[in-house]
Amino acid sequence: MIVRDYNKAKETDRRVVASQWESVRLLLKSDNMGFSFHITTIYEGAELPMEYKHHLESVYCLSGEGEVETLADGKIHPIRPGVIYILDHNDQHILRAKTEMQMACVFNPPLTGKEVHDSSGAYPLEAEAVTAD
């Protein structure tokens, strides 16, 4: 069994910080579960164009408000606590945070640890692994 404490994990290299977000990666590829699980905070006012070319992702809103726009059809979906959006076709999208948002994210294939978005809005398939348990 694996047991991790979010508050302890955010004090280790499991916490990855970028300019508009930070993410605590609680479950990663090295845990051999076939997916990764993160608690990600999107900062108020953030606008994040993304397209996960190598990963599928589901995102459940725990707190805050914003919207996600799918670029293929221009549809805008409100995001608030209790809403999940699923990127099941490597969808090109823009996430906008009206307030600070806390999201529970699941990736398949799992992230290795220190991924950040590249210029296209994607994560690489492999990145540096974290060292903390």
Curated annotation (Swiss-Prot):
Q: Does the keyword Lyase apply?
A: yes
The source's domain of life comes to Bacteria
Q: E.C. number, please? A: 4.2.1.108
Any Gene Ontology biological process: ectoine biosynthetic process
Give, as one word, the top-level EC class: lyase
- Provide this UniProt record's keywords sorted from A to Z: Lyase
Which pathway does the UniProt entry assign to this protein? Amine and polyamine biosynthesis; ectoine biosynthesis; L-ectoine from L-aspartate 4-semialdehyde: step 3/3
Catalytic reactions on record: (2S)-4-acetamido-2-aminobutanoate = L-ectoine + H2O
A GO molecular function assigned to this protein is: ectoine synthase activity
Q: Which family does it belong to?
A: Belongs to the ectoine synthase family.
Query: What is its biological role?
Result: Catalyzes the circularization of gamma-N-acetyl-alpha,gamma-diaminobutyric acid (ADABA) to ectoine (1,4,5,6-tetrahydro-2-methyl-4-pyrimidine carboxylic acid), which is an excellent osmoprotectant.
Q: Kindly provide the name given to this protein in its UniProt entry.
A: L-ectoine synthase
Organism of provenance? Nitrosococcus oceani (strain ATCC 19707 / BCRC 17464 / JCM 30415 / NCIMB 11848 / C-107)
